[in-house]
Amino acid sequence: MPNLSRLLEAYAQRVSALSRLQTYIGTDAGRRVMDGLVRRGDGENLHAVIWYSDLRDSTALAAAMPRDLYLGALNQYFDSVAGAVIEHGGEVLKFIGDAVLAIFPIDYPQEPQPAACMTALAAVGDAFKRMSEINKQRRADGESELSFGVALHRGNITYGNVGTVRRLDFTVIGPAVNEASRIEGLCKSLRTPVLISKRFADSVATNLRSLGHHELAGVEEPQEIFALPKP
């Protein structure tokens, strides 16, 4: 019995440690750290939906609000966006200031309409629904509404462990990640909260609206950008 007790205690400690790790660095990254996959340069190639979202007018919000109110607003935004991603099975990789980088891995890239693409679209709808509910409460409290833009793209990425020998980080890198960020950067100028790449648009049955071709920094050819259907 003493041996069983020690085994159960060790298991409980591992579960607790894994839960804390996953809270800070994500579900998959936390599992990899617990499994000892922490060498710099470890990684794998994936095909995935890439989600990049950003809080609108965050600099003005930060300047206009006391620190505690601004942090509260940030957390409301993250609850809406990251909460929706996680609820729909995505992996939140980073909070970059007020931006969220996440992925929905695609197991079978050769499929014409991967399920992960429709799942990501559902997560977008959920995120805006959550934000709408939060904004109702913010209006009732006399606070300004929050808004955000999001881009959906798909492509090959490298998911790996990078950094220095004393500070490592799990992240995704590759041209597709940069392109997703550039697409999201068009949300404000195009006055459209959700922008979608052609590669993603070709992967879903939803009738998306073409917004024409647009230049993306670091990308040679103008890219066709799509938006959700008008309600």
Predicted regions and their residues:
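Helical mechanochemical/support elements of P-loop NTPase systems and associated helical scaffolds
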Residues: 25, 29, 70, 77, ...
